Each structure stands twice: as structure tokens, then as C-alpha cells.
Swiss-Prot record, chain B:
Ubiquitously expressed. Isoform 3 is not found in erythroid cells. This is Codanin-1. Residues 214-232 have a biased composition (Polar residues). It comes from Homo sapiens (Human). The lineage of its organism: Eukaryota, Metazoa, Chordata, Craniata, Vertebrata. Changing R714W: In CDAN1A; partially disrupts ASF1 binding and loss the ability to arrest cells in S phase and inhibit DNA synthesis. It is found in: Cytoplasm; Nucleus; Membrane. Pfam families: Codanin-1_C. The modification Phosphothreonine is found at T71. Keywords: Acetylation, Congenital dyserythropoietic anemia, Cytoplasm, Disease variant, Hereditary hemolytic anemia, Membrane, Nucleus, Phosphoprotein, Transmembrane, Transmembrane helix.
Length: 287, 1227
């Protein structure tokens, strides 16, 4: 699951302009049978998000919105049961869920007196039954269930995955008898930055080829693949901040990471794709 | 001066008499009349003798040590002439010694004249001498131009300068200003020259050990204070390019001067000093001249001079002991004379006896002289580190000239344990976040808190970037980080934020640079680093590895300028780049406070009669503790000096004349940033000089030119000079300072006296009240000074330049190999431990006195233990009160608040008002804290003391110790509690109130009571995320679009619902949002089942799900909704127009599943009939195709027509389990 930069690039190369559908995912799995599905999905999702971030603006010009909306209207007039919105999104290379939001906003602007608030839009996307127009509700719903990178369902899955891995990590810590403070406890104590876990007694992780081990004061669980982009963002917003306060620590990218990114070990940020097995705890007889 | 030396050489006076004469103003009674007469006539010159002697020796040796200036700094007065210049030896005139450059045409015939002149000049008041100082350029050119005359005037003793200028006729452009020595009256034109700049050393011999920028080794005579800049600013002048530039300029000019001379004189006495153009002969071709004791030219003369010189050193009449040693080592390791001596005519014995012939006529003479001097200083040598001793003992010249000395050195080496070890610091460690000082409660506002959060991160980001780049060529701190630092400082608006940041800055400073390469980690007052507890084994390996990777580092010659090595550079540059007045002020406050705190630390005093082995162990600890405190103090003081004098330093020349007077008047009004004078006085009185002086020296080393002229600081210098004089190494006796303590003080003071801003004449001017330095008769019998707190490790750590001695010897061994500045590495200290407890500041009154007295005769560990216990128990007591009394009050507050909320309804009123009400009720209870605290200390302290003291402690001592511990702990705890308990309760209650109010708010689902998984659960259920993802796939397949071959098997659906059940029953991984989505997805799935929209895999005939299968799946769903979901399930979605509309697409429409589902929902009590009726009713309002609307109406009727049989039962259910279905899913 730890990929070299070259391996990662090969996968990323295959993901250029691929729509975020389950069909695409299936093809990807066939193309890289040796990689875990979760890793592939995580990479796919990240790559797609990068792509969307790059192209986001061009879909949000008023001309673009107007043209999409007209195409949508024309489409549903012809056949309301056809996947008009989904096809439109795929055609213009935009995420279906985001396209659904775009059209929904435009629709509500037209049909309501006051411009729709963000929370109303979000609520309607979560539960399309609330959308006043039945055809649009179906179209939106179709976009959402067919989008594997954006949308409320995907967000929920990601959140659940993150939570599950934190629980997993907590269990492992308990199993190893390592006492810790979790995020909630830290927040209650007034910490300004809170990793998932701070070890109350640090441990040393031994590395097979290195003479010395690495001290670990804190552990952060990341249920995603560590690519350059996300890792640098995490370093800046989280990992270094933890280091600045608590000293060296460990990041677990459960879905793997690019090997080359694990370059701050000496500095005190260690990357792993699983819970380390070779841990040495403070031995009281020595101390 | 020369007269004195000559009468000495002629044996008219004895060495002892001369030394007495120098050291004291009056002749001792032991002097015989003849001597007294000979010397008293020269009385006025007394003070000038030592500078003269030092310069004389330097000049005499300049042919042997051709690189000249890098020679250890000369003392006041300028260089003397090279006797053996190629043009012909000096012709019998004394003036020869005053030549710097070879061609000596005009020589002084009367050495006394310049002296007299100088003396006259000196009589003026100190500050006056600053007048007439010259600008930098003048000063530089003065090297060979007229300006040099001025320099002489200003010098404190050497007669030699003037003739040096004369000795170089081509450069003698102004004869009026620079008449021959002796003829120049000390007129106002006697301007002060700049300090002489030493050419960069390029000699082949010294190339490795010579610092390239040995700027502090200029002759003392050049007045530093008259000299602007370059030298002064360069060490920290990153932001002050002018300084650097002028240094360059000076170098350049010197270079030109030299090359001019080279052209003029056939034989270069000094190799051209430029760095870039090596002489052809530089490498390799030189062969060392062997030294032979048999070929020493005039033993007696050399012996005499060596004796006088040694005596001056021993009496601390020279400013810098180690500089002289360095010089002697240079003589010892001199490789060859620059010019061939053979051509010199034989000198007659008469000539040899006087000063007219060169003192050192050959390498043999040099080595002989050096060995003579070293013999007198065996004691100092034997206290050098083991490495230096080894090199000395193995030096073949030493063996050859004095087998006895060599034998003693060898013995000293073999017995030495003074291994100075090299340790690298572990990589940077951040200051840890401590909730007690760093959390929100310590900030005035949320904004300040979050701003500081960001600042901490920016600070470390900057630090890391510096670590990564500062060694890269071309990287510039200001360019790279300056704007970011200033932007960050700009955000520090509140004063409180500044103090937070300064605390972080100071802690990080101590942590990273406490000692140059200190083991880091252990910061004062902080827990020792975990690494050091993990076993010395690993740590040792780690450090050895790092040591190997460590780059060689030169400390910059025997007398380097104050610098900021390593990480210190970061902090200096940070201060400069930040250029924030507020920051500097807060930093000074904080540094001053910490310095006072550490300086006042009650370090255990030496107990001379500790005979058992335990004391040895104790001493290890004491020494370490002392080292930590001392090194921390030095670091803090250095930065305090840097910041405090920063506004007054600049590249421009120091002011003179009236301007200077007005500046002095102004500056003398400014109170010192820290009352160092008082601290020094107290330190001397308490015999803690060994702690106070080293940090004071660091502080003063950053003083600007005006500082030494201020009365306040003059007093300090006077005290330091007296102290210096009193530290006679040979006087060792009971009650005197330990040898290594003295050595440390001599080294740091000697270094200070060489700092350019410290006027060198200060040293020689000082009237020596000298002898016994009895500051105070009531000094304690045993102070820190009498305790062996300094070891070689600490000595070398504080004074890395002492290591230059070793480099010099090593480069002798290794020949000229290696040009990188020496292979010797920087000396860094071993790891040190954290401090023990601090003394309680509360010792007042009789009890306190008694307690003090009690400790006086107990081992120091007892006191430390008691203080430690008191400190910890006191602190724990506060925490205990917090966890018990305060926590109880908070609980009360919470229940009171709940009552309020119930009575006042949802809103609960204004939170601030609520808080006030609660606090007014609860704060009075805080009064109990004192009683509880007292009780706690009483209960806990004795046990702790008992556990920590040795078992054989007498019962009475033990119980006294316990009582004192109880008292101190109680005092500490109660002082804190009485001052803070109300605020503490208030703060905690406030936090509780906001917590409660927040909990009132959103996420009722999350707060709802939830069942955990059963005890037997092994948490093997599928993960919620996996299930959502799977169901989502089914949904997307059902909604389409899909490929023709896509579909799901009925078994898969069944399995999926089974898994869903497992997941819902194992709550381990389930979080509320996931459950909500699962609930919603399950409802969607049910709607698709009802509408028969799920594509089934298999032959086309089977494309649709069998009724039976569909019912079975719906049953499973119903059971999940009923039994397993703990959150609300949005069942009404089953009857949303969109989901019912799915049926519209199927042909033929089948309504039976929907009807079945509705009935089951009612049956299971998941939805009420009325609710369903309402939903069905609203369905009619939607727009449907005609036939569909009809069928829907039929369904409604069918459902409504059913007997209300389960109704009463249902109502019961609803009561038990309030209608879940009606609750809208949050999402």
C-alpha cells in the first residue's frame, strides 16, 4: 500500500478525465488488480477532487450555469426519466453531485422569491424529496447516488471511514496498554491543537534498518491515501502544529502513502500505513 | 620600559623585585636598596612595563611567526620592529624593537621619550582619551601612515608604534605628524588611531589553526572605543552591512599596504595576506627546522625574560592568560625563521646581553624560551583537557628541551580524567504545550488565543526553514524569513500575547542552545527528556553517530569575538528581523527575570568534611546542576546584552568630544536593564563569583563603546579587574577559590578584556589595589567559589577558545595538512540534568531562620529533598483542591443550572447573568480551600520526605525535615489558594456553564442515550462505511443508468440486510451520522423494493424480484427499523411523492407490497395510522397521471378501510416508544 512516486504517478495517469462513476472504479480495479480497492478509491477520489478544484471556476460562470440549465430543461422536456443531469455532468466533465447543486440552485432562484440559503440547498441534496419539482428531485437523486467522489452520501462514507479508523486505533492502543488522551479530552483541557491521540507516556518505534528508533508522542489517524497534495496540507495545518506542541509523532495513512513523502522522520514526523508492531515502551526498571 | 628590562638583563635588579615593582605601587621591604633605586627612578613607567614586555615579545617573535597579527593578541602598544630584517640587522639602537615593518631607517634613540609622552597623555581622565579619535579609514591607513603615531599615543604602554611608521619611508607622507619617536610631543594632534587590523593569516604553517577572521587579536593599544566598527559590529552585524564592508575595506587597504612594502623590501617578512593568491612556496616545500637545545644563543637572557614573563602571567598582570599560553605554544611549535639567520654577523656577547640584538635568534631560542615559560605554568597545563595534555606530552621538542617537564606532563596526562567530550544536540525539540499556561484561560480573548496558536506554528515553521537553509550559500535570513516574521509580530497586538510569545521564544532558546550543542531536552524546570531516560545505551550510540557527522568548527582563534554559534544565530537573526520594540522590551523583561531567578538559585554549598562515598555521587549531581545553571545564565545574559545594547550599537565611530560628553550625560541617566552591578557585588560577597561573573561577562561582551565610560559600568569593570588580579593561581589554600573555578574566571575575564569595545587601557590603567581581593570580611566561609563546581568540560564549554591550544599542538603534529581551519572539533558539554527544587522565597521570620540553620549542618541532599517535597506537595495540593472542592462546586453549579433551565424554559436566560448568580452562590465555599489544603499538606508531606531520605536519618532530623516540608508546602499552597481560589472557581463554573448551554443546543441524537454492543460482541461486524457504500451501489444500480449486464442477486440483498443488522447491533464503529445515513438508505431501499425497481441478476425472466423474496426483505427491514436502529428512521419518506412516484413507472403497477408495508408499519408500531393517513392525504395533492391518482386513491381507501384493530395496542406502543417515525432525520 506504500507506493513509490512512480507507481503512484502511473495510477494517477490513468485517472485523467475519468468520470466518478462506479463503472470507472470497476475499470480501475481491473487495471491495477494488485492494489487494494480502498487505496485505489482513495487515490481516485483525491485525483478527481484535484481535477475539480482546477476546473471548478469555469463551471461557475453565469454563462456556463445558464447554458447547463437550459440544456437540463430541454433534456427533461424531451424525457424526464432519462439521466439528463447525470449525462450532462459527465459530458462537461463535472462532478454529478456538484452539477445537481448547480442546477438546483438555479432552479430555486427561478421559482422562489428569495435566493435559497446554503442550508436549504444542503438539506434538499440530502433529502431530494424536499425538492418541489418531482422530476428535478429524481434527477438530483440519480446524480447523488451515482457520484462516488462528491455528495452527501460520499461525505458520510468518508466521515464514517475516518471514525472507524480512529476507533480501530483506539482499540489497538488499549490492547497495547498505552495510555492516551483523545481529541475530546484534549479539547476539554483547552489544547489549541488536538491530534487524535496523545500518548501520556511516549514510545519508541524501531525501524528495521535504522540504528535508532523514533520517539512517538502523538498519533494521527488518516483514513485516506497520503498523496503529496493532501500530505502537504496536513503537514501545514496539523502535523507540524502537533510537532510544535508535543514533539515527534506518528501519522497512520491507513490506505497507504507515497513513500517519498516519509522524509521527515528525523525531524519527528513518521508515516506508517498501519499500526507499528515494533514498539518499545518506557521500561520502568531503566528509568 | 626598556630600561627596566635592560637593568634586569644586566642583573642589576632581580626578577622578583621587578614583579613586585609592577604588581604593587611601592617597593617591598625585601627589595635591596640598589634595586629600589634602580626601579624607583622608573616609577612613572611602572604601569607600562607589562604592555611593553608583551609587545616586545610579540615583535621579537614576529619573524618566527611570520603571519604576524594572528599571533595572539598583543597587548597594548603596538608591535616592535623585526630585528632581523633582511636589509641588515638593527644597528644597535633600541628603537629596533619598535619597528613593525622591516626597513627601519629612523629609529628612536631614546625609548623613554615616547613613554614619557604616553604617560603624559595617560594622566588625563579616562574619557578624555577618546577625544581626537580618528575615523575608520584614517585608522586603517594608520597602519603605515601617519595615523599610527596617534595610535601610539593612545596605547597604554608600548613605545614602539611611532618608529614603525617611520620605518617605512615611502609611506611616510606626513613627517610633521609623525616625527621620529621621541620627538613628538603629546599634542592634541595625537589622535587616536583605530585598532590595528590583523592581516588574515596565510602562512603555510598556521593556515589550519589560524582563524580567518581573528579580529580580536589586535594589539590592545588600538583603542577599540575609538574604532568604529567593523570589528565591533561584525559578529552580530548581519543587519549592519556597513560594518562588514568596512572590515573588507580595511583588509583591502592592508593588503595593498603590505604588497607595497613587499615591493619595496626585497625579502618579505610577512607573506602577503591575501586569501586568494597563495604563494608558490606555501604548500609542502617547507621543512621544519629542528630545534636543538645546544644551539640556543643566549640562554641566560632568555631565561631571565622568560622568568619575568612567567611571573607577570602568574601574577595576572597580563590581561589574558590563555592568550599568552597560546603565544608560548606558538613559539614552541614554530617551524622556521622567515629569514635566514646565517648571514647575520656574529653578535658580540655585549650585544647579546642587551636588548639591541634580537631576543630570538633562531628556532632554538624560541623553543627554549617557550619551554622555560611552560615549566613555570605546569599547574595550568596539567589542568587542561586530556587531549591537550597528550599532545603536549608527546611533543618531541618539549622532550628534547625539558625531559623533566615532559615527564610531569606525561604523568599528568595519565592521571587525567578530564576528557572533554563532543556531544551533538539532538535535533530541535519544540517547547511543549502546557494547558496550565497555554490554554484559552490564559488569554484575554478568543482572538488572542487563536492568534497565538497561529504564531506558534509560524515560529516553528520559520525555525524549520532556517534549519533547512541557513547553511546553504546565498541564503539570507532577512530575505528568506524577515517579512514572515514581521507579519507574525504584527499580529501580536495584546501585551499578553507578547508575553506568551516571549515565553515561547525564551524557552525554545534555552532548549536549543542552553549549551553549545548541549544535550537539549533538559530545560530548566522541565521534565528531563524522555530520550535520556530510555537508557544511556541507545542514546550514546545516537550521539556517537551524530558526532561523526558533525562538521569541524573553529571557534575563531584564541580570542574570538562574541558570536552566536549554531542555533543561537537563529534567535539573534529573529530578533533583528522582527525589529519590534515591544518584543524586545518583553524579551528583556523576561530574560532579566530568569537571570535573577537562576542567579539567586540556592546551589548546594560544598561541605568539606563529607567523607563518605555518597558525597561523590552527590557532587556529580551538583556539578551537573551548576553547569546547567551557569550555561543557561550565560545564554540568557548574552541575549540580554545583545538586545539591551542593540539600540546603541552601530557602525559609526564612537562619538568624541562634546558629543561624547552629552551622550555620556544622557546615558548615565538611563537605568541599566538589569542591576548587574548589585548582582556582581552580591555575588562577590557571597563568594559566588564563579556563577555570576561568567554570565556577566557574556552580558558585557555586547556592550557598546559608551558603556565602559559610564560610571555604573566603570564600577563593574573595576570590580572585575580587581577580581582578575586576585585570582592568583598559585595561591591555593583552604578557603580560597578552587583552581578550576579560578581558571574559568581568568579565561572569561581575559576574553572580555580583549573585546574591542572594552578599552584595553582599562586593564593597565587600573591602579592595582590589587593584592588581596577582600571585598567583604563577612563573606561566608564557604561559598560556591570554594566548591569544585567547575570541571574541564564546563571550562571548555564556556571557553571553547581554550581548545585553540590543542588545535595548535595538533596542527604541529599533523604538519600543514588540512586547511579547513583545523580538524579539531568544537567542544561541547555532556548532557546535564534538570535542576532541583528552587528555594522557597518565603523564608522570613524566626522559623525560617531556624530552618536555615537546621539545614546548614545537614547534607545538601536533605535540603533539596525537603524543598522538592514542599514544592511538589504544594503544587499537588492546589490540584487536589481543584479535583475535589472545585469539582464539587462545579457539579453543584451544573445541577443549579439545570434547575434554572427547567424553571426558565428552553431559553434559560442570559448566560452571563446565570454565571453571576451561580458564582455568587458558590464562590463563598472557596474559603474551605485553605483548611482543606492545610490538611492535605499535613497528610502527604511527611510520607514523601520519609520515602526520599536515607533510612539512617536520625529520628529528630527526620521529624524536623517533615515539619519543615509540611510548613513550606502549606505556605506555598495557601498563598496560591488564598489569592486564586475565587478566580479558579469562577473560571471552572464558567466553563461548565458554557458546556451545559452548548450541550442544550444541537445534536439531540448524539446526546441521546445509546446502547453499546453486548458484552460478548467481538466487533467483527462489517464496518458502517462499507455498508453505506454497498447500499449506495445498489441504489445507484436501481436508479440507473446501468449496463445491461448489471444487477444484484436476491441473495446479495439478503446478505446486505443481514450485515446491516450485525453492524447496527455492534455499535463499536458506528457514529450517529453513519447511522442516520444507513437509516435513510434503508428506507430508500424499501421504496425501491416496493416499486420493484431493483434490477435482479440472472435470466431475463427472473429480472424482477419474486413477491415472496421482496416480502422477506421488507420483513428484514421492518425488523431492523424496529429492533436495531437506535436513531430515528425517516419512515415517512416511504410515502414521499418521489418514492411513491417510483410505482408510477412500473407496468403493471403492483400496490400490494406498499399496502403490506404500511400494514406492517402500523402493526409493528413504527408509524401511527393517523400519520400514515396524513401522508397519504398529502400525496393526493401532488400532480399525478390520471390513472395513477385513481389507483392511489384506491390504495388509500383500502388502507383506511381496514379495521382499526391494532389501534389501542398501537397507542400503547406509541406511549412506550414515542413515535419514532415522525422524527425527521437530522440529515
Amino acid at each position: 500500500m506504500i507506493l513509490t512516486k512512480a507507481q503512484y504517478d502511473e495510477i494517477a495517469q490513468c485517472l485523467v478525465s475519468v468520470p466518478p462513476t462506479r463503472q470507472s472504479l470497476r475499470k480501475l480495479k481491473q487495471r491495477f488488480p494488485s492494489q487494494s480497492q480502498a487505496t485505489l478509491l482513495s487515490i481516485f477520489s483525491q485525483e478527481y477532487q484535484k481535477h475539480i478544484k482546477r476546473t471548478h471556476a469555469k463551471h461557475h460562470t453565469s454563462e456556463a450555469i445558464e447554458s447547463y440549465y437550459q440544456r437540463y430543461l430541454n433534456g427533461v422536456v424531451k424525457n424526464g426519466a432519462a439521466p439528463v443531469l447525470l449525462d450532462l455532468a459527465n459530458e462537461v466533465d463535472y462532478a454529478p453531485s456538484l452539477m445537481a447543486r448547480l442546477i438546483l440552485e438555479r432552479f430555486l432562484q427561478e421559482h422562489e422569491e428569495t435566493p435559497p440559503s446554503k442550508s436549504i440547498i444542503n438539506s434538499m441534496l440530502r433529502d431530494p424529496s424536499q425538492i418541489p419539482d418531482g422530476v428535478l428531485a429524481n434527477q438530483v437523486y440519480q446524480c447523488i447516488v451515482n457520484d462516488c467522489c462528491y455528495g452527501p452520501l460520499v461525505d458520510c462514507i468518508k466521515h464514517a471511514i475516518g471514525h472507524e479508523h480512529e476507533v480501530l486505533l483506539r482499540d489497538l492502543l488499549l490492547e497495547k496498554n498505552l495510555s492516551f488522551l483523545d481529541e475530546d479530552q484534549l479539547r476539554a483541557k483547552g489544547y489549541d491543537k488536538t491530534p487524535d491521540f496523545i500518548l501520556q507516556v511516549p514510545v519508541v518505534m524501531l525501524c528495521p534498518l535504522a540504528v535508532e528508533g523514533h520517539i512517538i508522542h502523538w498519533i494521527e489517524s488518516k483514513a485516506s491515501f497520503g498523496d503529496e497534495c493532501s500530505h502537504h496540507a496536513y503537514l501545514h495545518d496539523q502535523f507540524w502544529s502537533y510537532w510544535n506542541r508535543f514533539g515527534p509523532g506518528l501519522v497512520i495513512y491507513w490506505y497507504g502513502f507515497i513513500q517519498e513523502l516519509d522524509c521527515n522522520r528525523e525531524r519527528g514526523i513518521l508515516l506508517k500505513a498501519c499500526f507499528p508492531t515494533n514498539i518499545v515502551t518506557l521500561c520502568h526498571s531503566i528509568a | 620600559m626598556a630600561a627596566v628590562l635592560e637593568s634586569l638583563l644586566r642583573e642589576e635588579v632581580s626578577v622578583a623585585a621587578v614583579v613586585r615593582w609592577i604588581a604593587r605601587s611601592t617597593q617591598g621591604s625585601e627589595d635591596n636598596a640598589g634595586e629600589a633605586a634602580a626601579l624607583s627612578s622608573l616609577r612613572a613607567l611602572r604601569k607600562e612595563f607589562v604592555p611593553f614586555l608583551l609587545n616586545f615579545l610579540r615583535e621579537q617573535s614576529s619573524r618566527v611567526l611570520p603571519q604576524g597579527p594572528p599571533t595572539p593578541a598583543k597587548t597594548p602598544g603596538a608591535s616592535a620592529a623585526l630585528p632581523g630584517r633582511p636589509g641588515g640587522p638593527p644597528r644597535g639602537s633600541r628603537g629596533a624593537r619598535s619597528q613593525l615593518f622591516p626597513p627601519t631607517e629612523a629609529q628612536s634613540t631614546a625609548a623613554e621619550a615616547p613613554l614619557a609622552r604616553r604617560g603624559g597623555r595617560r594622566r588625563g581622565p579616562g574619557p578624555a582619551r577618546e577625544r581626537g579619535g580618528r575615523g575608520l579609514e584614517e585608522g586603517v591607513s594608520g597602519e603605515s601612515l601617519p595615523g599610527a603615531g596617534g595610535r601610539r599615543l593612545r596605547g597604554s604602554g608600548s613605545p614602539s608604534r611611532p618608529s614603525l611608521t617611520l620605518s617605512d619611508p615611502p609611506n611616510l607622507s606626513n613627517l610633521e605628524e609623525f616625527p621620529p619617536v621621541g620627538s613628538v610631543p603629546p599634542g592634541p594632534t595625537g589622535t587616536k588611531p583605530s585598532r590595528r587590523i590583523n592581516p588574515t593569516p596565510v602562512s603555510e604553517e598556521r593556515s589550519l589553526s589560524k582563524p580567518k577572521t581573528c579580529f580580536t587579536s589586535p594589539p590592545i593599544s588600538c583603542v577599540p572605543s575609538s574604532q568604529p566598527s567593523a570589528l565591533d559590529t561584525s559578529p552580530w552585524g548581519l543587519g549592519l552591512p556597513p560594518g562588514c564592508r568596512s572590515l573588507q575595506e580595511e583588509r583591502e587597504m592592508l593588503r595593498k599596504e603590505r604588497s607595497k612594502q613587499l615591493q619595496q623590501s626585497p625579502t618579505p617578512t610577512c607573506p602577503t595576506p591575501e586569501l586568494g593568491s597563495p604563494l608558490p612556496s606555501r604548500t609542502g616545500s617547507l621543512t621544519d627546522e629542528p630545534a636543538d637545545p645546544a644551539r640556543v644563543s643566549s640562554r641566560q637572557r632568555l631565561e631571565l625574560v622568560a622568568l619575568v614573563y612567567s611571573s607577570c602571567i602568574a601574577e595576572n598582570l597580563v590581561p589574558n592568560l590563555f592568550l599568552e599560553l597560546f603565544f608560548v605554544f606558538q613559539l614552541l611549535t614554530a617551524r622556521r625563521m622567515v629569514t635566514a639567520k646565517d648571514s647575520d654577523p656574529e653578535l658580540s656577547p655585549a650585544v647579546l646581553d642587551s636588548l639591541e640584538s634580537p631576543l630570538f635568534q633562531s628556532i632554538h631560542d624560541c623553543v627554549f624560551f617557550a619551554v622555560q615559560v611552560l615549566e613555570c605554568h605546569f599547574q595550568v597545563l596539567s589542568n587542561l583537557d586530556k587531549g591537550t595534555l597528550k599532545l603536549l606530552a608527546e611533543n618531541e621538542r618539549l622532550l628534547c628541551f625539558s625531559p623533566a617537564l615532559q615527564g610531569r606532563l606525561r604523568a599528568a596526562y595519565e592521571g587525567s580524567v578530564a576528557k572533554v567530550s563532543l556531544v551533538m544536540p539532538p535535533s530541535t525539540q519544540a517547547v511543549s504545550f502546557q494547558p496550565e499556561t497555554d490554554n484559552r484561560a490564559n488569554f484575554s480573548s478568543d482572538r488572542a488565543f487563536h492568534t497565538f496558536k497561529k504564531q506558534r506554528d509560524v515560529f516553528y515553521e520559520v525555525l524549520r526553514e532556517w534549519e533547512d537553509h541557513h547553511e546553504e550559500p546565498g541564503w539570507d535570513f532577512e530575505k528568506g524569513l524577515g517579512s514572515r516574521i514581521r507579519a507574525m509580530m504584527g499580529q501580536l497586538s495584546a501585551a499578553c500575547s507578547h508575553s506568551h510569545f516571549v515565553r515561547l521564544f525564551q524557552k525554545q532558546l534555552l532548549q536549543m542552545c542552553q549549551s553549545p550543542g548541549g544535550a537539549g531536552g533538559t530545560v530548566l524546570g522541565e521534565a528531563p527528556d524522555v530520550l535520556s531516560m530510555l537508557g544511556a545505551d541507545k542514546l550514546g550510540r545516537l550521539w556517537r553517530l551524530q558526532e561523526r557527522l558533525m562538521a569541524p568548527q573553529s571557534s575563531g582563534g584564541p580570542c574570538p569575538p562574541p558570536t552566536f554559534p549554531g542555533c543561537q544565530g537563529f534567535f539573534r537573526d529573529f530578533i533583528l528581523s522582527a525589529s519590534s520594540f515591544q518584543f524586545n522590551q518583553h524579551l528583556m523583561d523576561s530574560l532579566s527575570l530568569k537571570i535573577q531567578e537562576l542567579n539567586g538559585l540556592a546551589l548546594p554549598q560544598h561541605e568539606p568534611n563529607d567523607e563518605d562515598g555518597e558525597s561523590d555521587v552527590d557532587w556529580q549531581g551538583e556539578r551537573k546542576q551548576f553547569a546547567v545553571v551557569l550555561l543557561s545564565l550565560r545564554l540568557l545574559a548574552k541575549f540580554l546584552g545583545f538586545v539591551a545594547f542593540l539600540p546603541y550599537r552601530g557602525p559609526e565611530p564612537p562619538p568624541t568630544g562634546e558629543l561624547q560628553d552629552s551622550i555620556l550625560a544622557l546615558r548615565s541617566q538611563v537605568p541599566p536593564v538589569l542591576d548587574v552591578r548589585t548582582l556582581l557585588q552580591r555575588g562577590l560577597q557571597a563568594r559566588r563569583a564563579v556563577l555570576t561573573v561568567p554570565w556577566l561577562v557574556e552580558f558585557l561582551s555586547f556592550a557598546d563603546h559608551v558603556v565602559p565610560l559610564l560610571e555604573y559600568y566603570r564600577d563593574i569593570f573595576t570590580l572585575l579587574l580587581r577580581l582578575h588580579r586576585s585570582l592568583v593561581l598559585s595561591q591555593e589554600s583552604e578557603g580560597k577559590m578552587c583552581f578550576l573555578n579560578k581558571l574559568l574566571l581568568l579565561a572569561v575575564l581575559g576574553w572580555l578584556f580583549q573585546i574591542p569595545t572594552v578599552p584595553e587601557d582599562l586593564f593597565f590603567l587600573e591602579e592595582g589595589p590589587s593584592y588581596a581581593f577582600e571585598v567583604d570580611t563577612v563573606a561566608p566561609e564557604h561559598g560556591l567559589d570554594n566548591a569544585p563546581v567547575v570541571d574541564q568540560q564546563l571550562l571548555y564549554t564556556c571557553c571553547p577558545y581554550i581548545g585553540e591550544l590543542r588545535k595548535l599542538l595538533a596542527s604541529w603534529v599533523s604538519g600543514s595538512s588540512g586547511r579547513s581551519g583545523g580538524f579539531m572539533r568544537k567542544i561541547t558539554p555532556t548532557t546535564t540534568t534538570s535542576l532541583g527544587a528552587q528555594p522557597s522565597q518565603t523564608s522570613q521570620g524566626l522559623q525560617a531562620q531556624l530552618a536555615q540553620a537546621f539545614f546548614h549542618n545537614q547534607p545538601p541532599s536533605l535540603r533539596r529533598t525537603v524543598e522538592f517535597v514542599a514544592e511538589r506537595i504544594g503544587s499537588n495540593c492546589v490540584k487536589h483542591i481543584k479535583a475535589t472542592l472545585v469539582a464539587d462546586l462545579v457539579r453543584q453549579a451544573e445541577s443549579l443550572l439545570q434547575e434554572q433551565l427547567v424553571t426558565q424554559g428552553e431559553e434559560g436566560g442570559d448566560p452571563a447573568q446565570l454565571l453571576e448568580i451561580l458564582c455568587s452562590q458558590l464562590c463563598p465555599h472557596g474559603a474551605q480551600a485553605l483548611a482543606l489544603g492545610r490538611e492535605f499538606c499535613q497528610r502527604k508531606s511527611p510520607g514523601a520526605v520519609r520515602a526520599l531520605l536515607p533510612e539512617e536519618t536520625p529520628a529528630a532530623v527526620l521529624s524536623s525535615a517533615e515539619n519543615i516540608a509540611v510548613g513550606l508546602a502549606t505556605e506555598k499552597a495557601c498563598a496560591w489558594l488564598s489569592a486564586n481560589i475565587t478566580a479558579l472557581i469562577r473560571r471552572e463554573v464558567k466553563a461548565a456553564v458554557s458546556r451545559t448551554l452548548r450541550a442544550q443546543g444541537p445534536e439531540p441524537a448524539a446526546r441521546g442515550e445509546r446502547r453499546g454492543c453486548s458484552r460478548a460482541c467481538e466487533h467483527h461486524a462489517p464496518l458502517p462505511s462499507h455498508l453505506i457504500s454497498e447500499i449506495k451501489d445498489v441504489l445507484s444500480l436501481a436508479v440507473g443508468p446501468r449496463d445491461p449486464d448489471e444487477g444484484v442477486s436476491p441473495e446479495h440483498l439478503e446478505q446486505l440486510l443481514g450485515q446491516l443488522g450485525q453492524t447496527l447491533r455492534c455499535r463499536q464503529f458506528l457514529c450517529p451520522p453513519a447511522e442516520q445515513h444507513l437509516a435513510k438508505c434503508s428506507v430508500e431501499l424499501a421504496s425501491l423494493l416496493v416499486a420493484d425497481q431493483i434490477p435482479i441478476l440472472g435470466p431475463p425472466a427472473q429480472y424482477r424480484l419474486e413477491r415472496g423474496q421482496a416480502r422477506r426483505l421488507l420483513h428484514m427491514l421492518l425488523s431492523l427499523w424496529k429492533e436495531d436502529f437506535q436513531g430515528p428512521v425517516p419512515l415517512q419518506l416511504l410515502l414521499s411523492p418521489r418514492n411513491v412516484g417510483l410505482l408510477a413507472d412500473t407496468r403493471p403497477r403492483e400496490w400490494d407490497l406498499l399496502l403490506f408495508l404500511l400494514r406492517e408499519l402500523v402493526e409493528k408500531g413504527l408509524m401511527g395510522r393517523m400519520e400514515i393517513e396524513a401522508c397519504l392525504g398529502s400525496l393526493h395533492q401532488a400532480q399525478w397521471p390520471g390513472d395513477f391518482a385513481e389507483e392511489l386513491a384506491t390504495l388509500s381507501n383500502l388502507f383506511l378501510a381496514e379495521p382499526h384493530l391494532p389501534e389501542p395496542q398501537l397507542r400503547a406502543c406509541e406511549l412506550v416508544q414515542p413515535n419514532r417515525g415522525t422524527v425527521l432525520a437530522q440529515s
